[in-house]
Amino acid sequence: MGAAVFIGMGGSACAQTRPSRNLTVFKTPTCACCDAWIAHMRQAGFTTTITVLPSLQSVRSSRGMPDALASCHTGLIDGYLVEGHVPAPDVIRLLAERPAAVGVAVPGMPLGSPGMETPQGRKEPYDTLLVLRSGATRVFARHNPPA
């Protein structure tokens, strides 16, 4: 009987340390690129719940995301905000490393980021920023560096 309790507790501990793949996405009704980003996240193995709101400002501000980093959609996963067109590998890394942070952000809508692809394949350089609880940021990942 003791072994069964030990195994049950071990399984529970493993389940608690496994990062979630359940992403809640807040978006406005007119955002088309948001749907492309959601498809990118689903292809990477995330399940999504979509909430359509007239404004995302209260979602961001209530969780500590600075307005200066705002984009067209906001994700919430395991207590972290994912602001804008953040690539799935960056979210996976965030969940694995679990930094003391509000989340990650790709401010604006850089061409070539997930959901902002162009038919011509144009890609702008951009950074994924780690947003610290103080509101400060640091570069978390760099994408599409200039040739």
Residue positions per predicted region:
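Active-site-proximal beta-strand/loop segments in catalytic clefts of secreted hydrolases
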Residues: 26-28, 53-54, 85, 107-109
